[in-house]
């Protein structure tokens, strides 16, 4: 995924009111930008460190700048815009980077599914013309950015929505489909991922149940810069 134009740089002052962040531009002026991450952003807020942002030319937007990336105290790059995770996943499937998700004919986004009225992030299917078409593959994408004591964790806050998605994926497996939970690791310092039992024990328990039920758990690291981002390689998941 190429960013055109490239992201511009500033310095983090503070994040507040969930959707707003104050930064200092390179010319010394201070501005408020939109924060697209509605989570806790635990261990992602490093005041005084570099941030990168995109600029929209939409005149209807109150805040034209959107926070995209951040620098950690250790110099790692963190993808702040969780909305980019789905596109990163789609690009990686189409380019063959995610080897486990190849040889399907069609890719669809945001398809309704399940008994709890969810929308799957990515659905892979075969054409009906195949003599033996593969089972549908339902892929739920999650952005992982929490690094604590050298370990990557998900989630960074209690997520009832994430719990619902795990139940939906297990339901798809019970119906004979393929179901995948894909962690897009948007933190260059994370080398492995595990459930954050200390933050959301219910999610951790459901993740274990989902794995035992046949839901595939994958994680891929992201290579990031102000110019581009792409999934790079498989990342171990500790279950």
Curated annotation (Swiss-Prot):
GO molecular function, one term: DNA binding
Organism domain of life: Bacteria
Signal peptide: none
CDD domains: SfsA-like_bacterial
PANTHER family from the UniProt entry: SUGAR FERMENTATION STIMULATION PROTEIN A
Family: Belongs to the SfsA family.
Protein name per UniProt: Sugar fermentation stimulation protein homolog
Organism, as annotated: Shewanella woodyi (strain ATCC 51908 / MS32)
Gene that this polypeptide is encoded by: sfsA
